[in-house]
């Protein structure tokens, strides 16, 4: 099988190596460029949970002012891995898609606790 990866190398490298080791032909043609955007300052104390839909969100987020024990919902294992590397401790992880993430949030977060970001 020939597999084409279009994400930036740092987001694809692990899978590229894995598929090559399995004997597949792999090409890398990055057509997606991920860049930081400026955003309004966020008071993280206003939130009881954070939803991360991408490891890239964590890559560009200033995490110094965030309590690392806050509940974090992660879309998949790559996002979870990035959150762990930044010191987050209270992670709930879906199976890699938004539909599963939504169900996980509905099952595990009581909105009476406060707001989510």
Q: Language-model features: where?
A:
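Signature of uroporphyrinogen-III synthase
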Residues: 1-117
């Amino acid at each position: 099988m020939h597999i084409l990866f279009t994400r930036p190398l740092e987001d694809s490298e692990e899978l590229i190596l894995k598929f090559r080791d399995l004997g597949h032909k792999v090409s890398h043609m990055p057509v997606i460029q991920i860049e930081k955007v400026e955003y309004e300052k966020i008071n993280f104390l206003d939130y009881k949970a954070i939803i991360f839909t991408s490891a890239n969100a964590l890559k560009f987020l200033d995490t110094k002012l965030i309590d690392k024990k806050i509940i974090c919902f992660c879309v998949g294992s790559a996002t979870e891995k990035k959150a762990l590397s930044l010191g987050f401790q209270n992670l709930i992880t879906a199976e890699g898609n938004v539909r599963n993430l939504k169900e996980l949030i509905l099952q595990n977060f009581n909105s009476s606790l406060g707001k989510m970001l």
